[in-house]
């Protein structure tokens, strides 16, 4: 059983200093965006999944709705456009790299890249909701705030790099055919 982690004080101070309206949500221990949605009784598209990615030689924080998967080729194009350099490979680094580079536990990737000096890339599908729930870097706390405020705060680069998961669509098709 995971030990309860306090909300990251650095993040709380960051949000307070920025004067950003937000809600600190305390919840049972969760390790995935899917579990966070179920625990907080939220729709998957309202949960921002935070992914550390390595594009070429640089690290970025990619945010996609929890009901989407990451399209690595599309993300490479977004990064290339942003950086002005061609990007051949985009990958998710190992948990060890995450722990060593950012000094965080695997699975507790905060959505707030500025705290880690990482550029934030946000899939445009997250802008379809007014408010979203973002990872705080704790397994027991999340931050709910307006998506437009998050974009402004983090200088998030918007792009199209999420693919809607097919699981729900396939389930609906099976139900209709029965």
Show where each model-derived region lies.
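Extended, low-hydrophobicity, polar/charged segments
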Residues: 1-178
């Amino acid at each position: 059983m995971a030990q309860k982690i306090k909300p990251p004080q650095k993040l709380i101070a960051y949000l307070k200093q920025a004067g950003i309206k937000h809600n600190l949500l305390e919840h049972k221990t969760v390790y995935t965006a899917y579990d966070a949605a179920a625990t907080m009784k939220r729709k998957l598209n309202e949960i921002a999944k935070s992914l550390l990615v390595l594009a070429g030689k640089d690290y970025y924080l990619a945010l996609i709705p929890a009901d989407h998967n990451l399209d690595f080729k599309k993300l490479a194009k977004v990064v290339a456009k942003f950086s002005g350099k061609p990007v051949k490979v985009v990958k998710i680094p190992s948990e060890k790299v995450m722990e060593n580079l950012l000094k965080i536990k695997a699975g507790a990737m905060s959505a707030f890249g500025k705290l880690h000096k990482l550029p934030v890339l946000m899939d445009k599908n997250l802008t379809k909701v007014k408010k979203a729930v973002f990872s705080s870097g704790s397994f027991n706390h999340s931050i709910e705030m307006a998506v437009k405020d998050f974009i402004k705060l983090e200088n998030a680069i918007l792009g199209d790099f999420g693919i809607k998961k097919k699981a729900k669509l396939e389930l609906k098709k099976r139900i209709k055919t029965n």
